[in-house]
Amino acid sequence: TDVSLVFEGGVTYNSGSVTIPGGIENLVFVGVASDAGELPVLEIPTISLKEVMNGITFENVHLDGLNDGKNYLFGIGNSSCFRSISFTGCTIAHYNRSILRFNTDKLEIDEILFDDCMITDIAHDGYGMIVFGKAQTRVGLVSVTKSTLTEMGSLMQLNDGIEKVVMDQCIVYNNTFATKNYYRIDKQPGAISVTNTIFAGSNNGQKFNATYSNYSTYFLFTSSYMTSDIIIDRYGFTDITPYSGTSEDLFVDPANGDFHLKSTAKFPGKETAGDPRWW
């Protein structure tokens, strides 16, 4: 059975934690924006599955975890998982640990997609936005594209069985929150690339590692940029292009969420790097 749930823009739906019952093969959460362009707000601390599903889709909704304890939007702890999941045109906020955490092994997942999203305040209590805590049978693709990520803990923890990881045309900015590292790779994926992405922000004045350990032989940040207010501890962004100015020199008002480029920025990645919503 395929099910679509349609939500009205400008309305807040406080459903509490959700359990998807058995018998649903594909489930879509879709928002219809209000006349003012507002998305529906879905206040969902966590979602669990009763059995294996084919696909889960979120489109044009605001997902708010309410920082409800040590929460994950999806904390997959057994074989009841999806074959694919996608977030398109969404805003996602306030999940203390992860959006997606896989704490069981031998899963088969075709793809995990985030596209055209605004994501903030994730993984402040450890873990990361996407976490594979154990080896998997196969994960075809993990993709994060055309998105703005702010005040983030770790972005990804990767493990055995992942074929391809792509991050392209994103902005990653930490100002008030201090992460320790963005990427942890416990087992090298088949392919991994972070391209046309801008890393920015003072990280609350704290130095940090781009990666948990040294992956420089295979993990490159070609055609990506890093602002001068970032202070690297030990492991940096291999092959990244430094930008001579700070986040405030590059963006109009990053501390308040405006990542349009300043006309005075003289940024070589203009209209190629970063989230296209700000071009």
In which residue ranges do the predicted regions lie?
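Extracellular beta-rich repeat passengers
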Residues: 18-258, 265-279
